[in-house]
């Protein structure tokens, strides 16, 4: 089996819900670009992966796949994922890692289809189920977090992950408010997206 083509289909996601994961991102609804990466083989199998997000533009990513990486992929054995990774990962810098990641995901998808199993089986999964948690956006007040956490708990979610504003004093108040609201028997987590230095990480923790 050999790779014969690589295609990227770009579309617009209109009216993205007003969600944010940092205070620096506007909260109004907007339009985002997404893309589907397709790695096509001579045996009719295709590997698929998504590229892009609701929070960032695609920029030059689709062109990078077609102009830089497609010539490196066509003719390769798609099951030789590690060899392909070694050949393309030298370009891994900045935003290009998004592109390389999409290619890698598409290759895993293709390999799973060739084997007739889900991707997680190829990766050695052994559980039949895993616990799921609810994740917040960024809000401006502790009360909003507390209300949302209670709502998720009542809906049966087993844990709640807080994306705080990344202001240590406020983040501590948010954690305290959520803990009071959901009780001591409910798991909460904090994802500050690399915002703290070491002293503040210890302080908030």
Question: For each predicted feature, which ranges?
Answer:
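Conserved active-site and cofactor/substrate-binding residues in soluble primary-metabolism enzymes
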Residues: 31-32, 60, 64, 79, ...
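Generic secondary-structure signature for well-ordered alpha-helical cores
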Residues: 8-11, 42-45, 71-74, 78, ...
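Flexible, glycine/charged-enriched surface loops at secondary-structure junctions
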Residues: 81, 119-122, 163
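Glycine-rich, aromatic-flanked loop segments that form ligand/cofactor-binding clefts
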Residues: 40, 104-139
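Metal-dependent enolase-superfamily TIM-barrel catalytic cores that perform enediolate-based chemistry
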Residues: 128-205
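Structured beta-strand/loop patches that form or line metal/cofactor-binding pockets in enzymes
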Residues: 1-48, 54
């Amino acid at each position: 089996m050999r790779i014969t083509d690589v295609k990227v289909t770009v579309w617009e996601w209109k009216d993205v819900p007003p969600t944010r994961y940092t205070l620096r991102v506007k909260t109004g609804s907007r339009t985002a670009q997404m893309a589907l990466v397709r790695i096509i083989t001579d045996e009719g199998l295709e590997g698929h992966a998504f590229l892009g997000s609701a929070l960032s533009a695609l920029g030059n990513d689709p062109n990078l796949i077609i102009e830089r990486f497609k010539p490196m992929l066509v003719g390769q054995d798609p099951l030789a994922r590690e060899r392909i990774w070694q050949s393309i990962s030298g370009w891994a810098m900045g935003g290009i890692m998004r592109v390389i990641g999409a290619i890698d995901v598409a290759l895993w998808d293709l390999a799973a289809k060739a084997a007739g199993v889900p991707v997680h089986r190829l990766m050695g999964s052994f559980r039949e189920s895993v616990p799921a948690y609810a994740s917040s956006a960024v809000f401006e007040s502790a009360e909003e977090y507390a209300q949302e956490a209670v709502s998720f708990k009542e809906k049966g979610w087993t844990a709640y992950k807080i994306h705080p504003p990344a202001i240590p004093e406020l983040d501590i108040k948010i954690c305290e408010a959520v803990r009071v609201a959901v009780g001591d028997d409910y798991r909460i987590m904090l994802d500050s997206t690399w915002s703290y230095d070491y002293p503040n990480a210890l302080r908030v923790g």
